[in-house]
Structure formats: C-alpha cells, structure tokens
Amino acid sequence: MSSAIESWADAGDEFSVPADIIQNPDGTKTVITFRTNQDGKKVKITQKIKEVIVREKVHPLIAQRKNWAKYGKEKHSSPGPDTSTTQLGEKVDLKLGLSWKQVEKKEEEDKAQERASRVVVQTIKCRVCGGDHYTAKCPFKDTLGASTLNGGTPEPGSEGAGDADAVTSTGRYIPRHLRPDANGNIPTREARDDSTTLKVSQLNTFVDEDMLRNELFARFGPLQRVTVVRDRETGESRGFAYVSFATEEIAQKALDLLNGKGYHSLILHLEWSKKKKPL
C-alpha cells in the first residue's frame, strides 16, 4: 500500500518528468516540462530561454576591493555582501567641482522667478469699495449706495456712512465693533471683571494649573479661573499665573495666607491683578 501524500509539493514531485532541453541554432534553448495542475490534469510547459551576459564596468579600485579576503565571522562566506550581516545603503553620486556657488545662485534665481510667476497682478478694481472684483458683483454695492459710486460721500451718521467705514481703501472689511462712530470714537467692549483675580508670581517653571489648583488654592473653595502664563513659542511657563476666586473676601484671605510663603524652592508673591482704588 502506498503511503499517503503529506503535502502538495510531494504530490507534484510524484508526477514530475525530467525536463527536455533543446539547444536552438540562434543560441537560445527550449525547456519542455510536464506538470500536474490544480485540476489533477497533466500539462506541458514550453519555455524559450535566452541567456544574456551583462558586463558592468566599475572603477579599478572597486574591483580591487571586491577581491579582498574576508575575515572574522565572514571568513568563509561567499564573495559579495551578505544581506544578513551587511546593510546596503543608497548609492550617492558625489560630483566635486569649484562652481557650486554659481549652481546654488542659479537655483535661488529659478525659485525667485517661480514665486514671481505665481503672483497674480490685480487688473480689476471695484469702483465702490476698491476690491479686486467687478463693480456689478460688489457685495457692498447696496449698502454703500449710489453716492459713493458717483463720487460723492454719504452724510455722517447715516447708515451708508457706517457701512462705508466698514471698507477701507484696500477693500478690507472692518467689524462693526471696531468702526468709529459719527464723533470719531471707537467703541470698546465691556472690560472683564478682574476684581477677584490675584496675580501669583515667582513660580517654578514646572508648576502648572493643576498643581496650583490642588496644592495651593483648593482650601479656599471653588475657583473661577486658573491660568499659567506661558511662552508662545516654547510653551514653557514664564513664572507667574492668574487665579480668580468666587469673591473678593476669599481672594483677600488667600493673599494674606500665601503671600511670602515658600513653594517648590521659591518664595511666592501674590498681588491683585488690578490695582485697588483707595477707599
């Protein structure tokens, strides 16, 4: 009884036939083999092979280094680098010369010309607001009125005057809260109430909002705001913070208890963020 075939590779070897190689007059050779496909049928495979010898010309020093004898653990290895022990890097062609400054200057000039070609020259100017669009498509045409279009100016204090102030000579839009009124005054937003805010200075750089809230000011009840002032570029603390309390009485109590106390190797200095008016 024949033994069971354990793998498909063994099954292929059982039906394999030695290859028939035919040398052709043109230097090629034809290899004919027989194999069994997935359906269990025996198929004939014909391959025409042409051997091409590629000769690469290298520098004599490179050829000399290839003939060096290997040593150490690679003493009995075959010629050439072994990918298991040698990491092959990318081939870099180094071109030496004295005109590298001229080449860099030319590259900079090409980049400058490319940037200049991308600049769009403004050829369209609106007669109403001066923007880079057609007058008929001006978004401020209805608000500025026909007087601006005809060369006149709206009367001060009118709705058209307020909208006209919203657009500068360059066509930039000015928000309403930043426009001057009829008297030339710029309205200001309501100032934030900092009457219960303390400025805490002389802090260590690693102190953050959570440390201030939990280690220093948690005993004084809920806090409205804790902000450590940081550098915009590095994000590192600048050594001071602002803490807002629920009432002025609680803030005064924290000022009296913590001012001049030590905290992480530094002496705290607490003061009101906004100067108090004398009574």
UniProtKB/Swiss-Prot annotation:
Task: Provide the species name.
Answer: Lodderomyces elongisporus (strain ATCC 11503 / CBS 2605 / JCM 1781 / NBRC 1676 / NRRL YB-4239) (Yeast)
The record's PROSITE patterns line, in alphabetical order, gives: RRM (PS50102)
| Keyword Nucleotide-binding set for record | no
Q: What biological processes does GO assign it?
A: formation of cytoplasmic translation initiation complex; translation reinitiation; translational termination
Which family would the database say this protein is a member of? Answer: Belongs to the eIF-3 subunit G family.
Record's subcellular location: Cytoplasm
Q: Is Nucleotidyltransferase one of the keywords?
A: no
The record's InterPro entries line, in alphabetical order, gives:
eIF3_g (IPR017334), eIF3g_N (IPR024675), eIF3G_RRM (IPR034240), Nucleotide-bd_a/b_plait_sf (IPR012677), RBD_domain_sf (IPR035979), RRM_dom (IPR000504)
Q: What is this protein called?
A: Eukaryotic translation initiation factor 3 subunit G
**All copies of domain RRM, residue ranges:** 196-275
Where is the PTM Phosphoserine found along the chain? 77
